[in-house]
Amino acid sequence: MDRNVYEACSNIIKEFGTHVVSADEVLAEKIDNAVPIPFKTREEIDADVEKDRNEGVFEGNIIPDIDLRVVHYYATQLCLNKYPHLINAFDETSLITLGLLIEKWVKDYLTSIQTEQGRQSKVIGKGPCEFISKHIDYRHAPGNI
C-alpha cells in the first residue's frame, strides 16, 4: 500500500494494528530516511517554549490550541471547491502556520476595544486582521475565497 502524509494526518494508517503512524514517519519512509526528521516529545517542546518565553522571544503557545484537523478539513474543502487541482497540497507546516495565523487574527480581533466619545466599541485591531478581510457568506458561497 502506498501510504501518504495526508492519510497519516487523518490517523488512517495503523502499524501492526496497534498504533497510528505519524505523518513524520510516513514522510521519512518516502525519502528512504535520507534526511533525518527530528522528533520532539511534548516535554521537549514545552521546555523549549518555556526557555524562549523567558528570553522574550515570543508570547503564547508554539503549537496552536485550536483543533488543526478541523482547520485542515475546512481549508481543504474551501480551496478544493474553487481549485480542485490543489488536492493534497497541504502539509504539516502549512497546517501549523494556518492554525497560528487564525489564532493571531482571533486574538487581534477579540482584544481590540477602543473608546470613542466616552463609549467602548469593538473594532478590528491593528495588524493582519485590518488588512486581510473579505465579507463572505460561506453558507451560500463556500468556495469563494
UniProtKB/Swiss-Prot annotation:
<protein>
    <recommendedName>
        <fullName>RNA polymerase I-specific transcription initiation factor RRN10</fullName>
    </recommendedName>
</protein>
<keyword id="KW-0805">Transcription regulation</keyword>
<comment type="subunit">
    <text>Component of the UAF (upstream activation factor) complex which consists of UAF30, RRN5, RRN9, RRN10, and histones H3 and H4.</text>
</comment>
<dbReference type="GO" id="GO:0042790">
    <property type="term" value="P:nucleolar large rRNA transcription by RNA polymerase I"/>
</dbReference>
<dbReference type="InterPro" id="IPR007898">
    <property type="entry name" value="Rrn10_Saccharomycetes"/>
</dbReference>
<comment type="function">
    <text>Component of the UAF (upstream activation factor) complex which interacts with the upstream element of the RNA polymerase I promoter and forms a stable preinitiation complex. Together with SPT15/TBP UAF seems to stimulate basal transcription to a fully activated level.</text>
</comment>
<keyword id="KW-0539">Nucleus</keyword>
<dbReference type="GO" id="GO:0045943">
    <property type="term" value="P:positive regulation of transcription by RNA polymerase I"/>
</dbReference>
<dbReference type="GO" id="GO:0000500">
    <property type="term" value="C:RNA polymerase I upstream activating factor complex"/>
</dbReference>
<dbReference type="GO" id="GO:0001165">
    <property type="term" value="F:RNA polymerase I cis-regulatory region sequence-specific DNA binding"/>
</dbReference>
<dbReference type="Pfam" id="PF05234">
    <property type="entry name" value="UAF_Rrn10"/>
</dbReference>
<dbReference type="GO" id="GO:0001181">
    <property type="term" value="F:RNA polymerase I general transcription initiation factor activity"/>
</dbReference>
<dbReference type="GO" id="GO:0005730">
    <property type="term" value="C:nucleolus"/>
</dbReference>
<dbReference type="InterPro" id="IPR022793">
    <property type="entry name" value="Rrn10"/>
</dbReference>
<keyword id="KW-0804">Transcription</keyword>
<dbReference type="GO" id="GO:0005634">
    <property type="term" value="C:nucleus"/>
</dbReference>
